[in-house]
Amino acid sequence: MARIFQPKKKTQLNTRHQAVQVERLDHHGAGIAYLKKKPLFIDGALPGEEVVTQLVEEKSKFARGKLIKILKPSDARVEPFCPHYHECGGCDLQHLNYDQQLTHKQQTLRQLMRKFAGSDIDLDAPVLGESLGYRRRARVSLFVDKKTRQLHFGFRKKQSKQIAQVTDCPVLAPELNVLLPEIYSVLKAFKKPDQLGHVELVLGDNGPCITLRHLSNLADDEVSALVELATRHQASLYLMPETDQLNLVAGEVPFYQEAGVKIPFDPNNFIQVNQAVNQKMVEQAIKWLDPQSDERVLDLFCGLGNFSLPIAKRAKHVVGVEGVAEMVEKASNNASLNQINNAQFYHANLEQDFDGQAWAAEKFDKVLLDPARAGASGIIDQVSALGAQRVVYVSCNPATLARDSQSLLDQGYQLTKLGMLDMFPHTSHLESMALFEKS
């Protein structure tokens, strides 16, 4: 006899307002309270606060609530400095004073390393820059309302694809922030605003750079308006049509200088968002790695050469390996530009075993890793085979750092230094650096 499928009835969500006590923050900065012994995550709530919340999601092991009202505020609560805070999905910790933000991030790093790597050491002093005006790059989203034909210009709303209208961003570098209202004014006069993709802003040492992604050809007067704007602000202008080909229309190729090295880049290349913290990060990595003039150093996930090239000025030989072929070519060109002859760069898939690669057959005294958020799980188990006595791991995700650290510890390394870098003030994003050594 055939069974007739009957879908389970959905559990009715109790949406009435409920008062709860917030106990702590999770690793992403959300407050955690408990409702019937189940963790309840509330964005915007702080430890010690009594708040009124409304359930928006309930699972078997956790629930999420919307912050409705704060009955008893924390002493650490501050008024957000940005008028777009409650809409924009960017700076999610503005309601927490900056010192407590740093404390929270350091506690998060230490807790994750203790839980997943079994390591508990004192942290080095955090690496800090300015807490405002620090972002040297941003992607501005564009969207045209089909009913009103109005162009929306700004950043994604929290946990949404919708756009918060933003023409003033306090964490954006002043040289870029001043461009926002003027770019919006120019773009909203375009004949086909629905054919615009997004705007990429980046600040090089030689000035700001504007990149417009567009899906159809622009009219001559539209290009002229953009060129006039860029020229007035001594900015470079790139146009990027559907072919993804970058076309430099005004100005020059952007670059930045780090530890005595000049690094040109295209506006769609990855560079660190916070220049001041990046500079200190490179300096600290070199200090911890301590490359000597008779040593060979391997830089995995090398990108444009942000670490490789400064290290090459101190080591006998540097090998940089990167998974994006275009970046490998640019790193090689950057080495030539800086007259660095002791650095070689290779393209390889660093998400899988690197046995058989020519560069991997060589031995190295020291290794630096700077992977993306996913970490280095594909290759981390092979680090010891490279012969390195010292490994510096730069991470933008403490969870994958903790996971990969366990592998390094299993290979006989000891964690001797650990520190947090506040690359993204007022957000829950956490950059960190760890030093592993073999005795």
From Swiss-Prot:
[4Fe-4S] cluster binds at residues 82, 88, 91, 169. It catalyses: uridine(1939) in 23S rRNA + S-adenosyl-L-methionine = 5-methyluridine(1939) in 23S rRNA + S-adenosyl-L-homocysteine + H(+). Its EC number is 2.1.1.190. The keyword rRNA-binding does not apply. The active site is at 396 (nucleophile). InterPro entries: 23S_rRNA_MeTrfase_RlmD, MeTrfase_TrmA_AS, MeTrfase_TrmA_CS, NA-bd_OB-fold, SAM-dependent_MTases_sf, TRAM_dom, U5_MeTrfase_fam. Keywords: 4Fe-4S, Iron, Iron-sulfur, Metal-binding, Methyltransferase, rRNA processing, S-adenosyl-L-methionine, Transferase. Residues 10-69 form the TRAM domain. Disulfide bonds: none annotated. S-adenosyl-L-methionine binds at residues 272, 301, 306, 322, 349, 370. It comes from the Bacteria. Belongs to the class I-like SAM-binding methyltransferase superfamily. RNA M5U methyltransferase family. RlmD subfamily. Catalyzes the formation of 5-methyl-uridine at position 1939 (m5U1939) in 23S rRNA. This is 23S rRNA (uracil(1939)-C(5))-methyltransferase RlmD. It comes from Vibrio parahaemolyticus serotype O3:K6 (strain RIMD 2210633). The gene is rlmD.
